[in-house]
Amino acid sequence: MRWPGWLTLLPGWRARLRVLLPLYIATWLAGYCALLGLGSVSSDPELLTITGTLMTLGFILSLVLRLASIPRRAILLLLGCVGLVLGLLQLRQFTVSVPGSAAVAPSILPALGFAWLLVILSYTLVTNDWLLFVIPLSLAILGLSGTENPNPDMSGYFLVFAVASLFAVSYHNYLRYVPVQR
């Protein structure tokens, strides 16, 4: 398998990937369970597709940026530039609609806002502490969407969320005490 040239130049990136991947997967799973919970109360099928895809791409990009040792300030600047471009595109279209907002009950709008915050945040997860911030946002999304439509699916999403969150917090604590190549 041939890797990109800039990735092979980093010393020890495979060992770092092996150490960081379980934490990224566990927090991604916790966030995705929240999006699934929101998708179960929304009648818009595109909402889960768009938010899930963007969040997954954000997690992958964050992991690659972390392996490449890109400074956090550069990532925030990049995120700000992308947000500015997207904002200008929205102004050009003279629309303020967010995918999913038309098909969601008014009581779910805060959960929808948290879901989009989770999607934006997924592009900046370059430290272990930032990764753990996915858990409270996901819990808020699950709680807000679970009060609107309590169904058996929500119990399953919460169970998977709880297991993934417990693993992420435990693994984060493990990484604090084990010397890791950073």
What are these regions (language model features)?
Residues 1-182:
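Linear, non-domain "peripheral" regions
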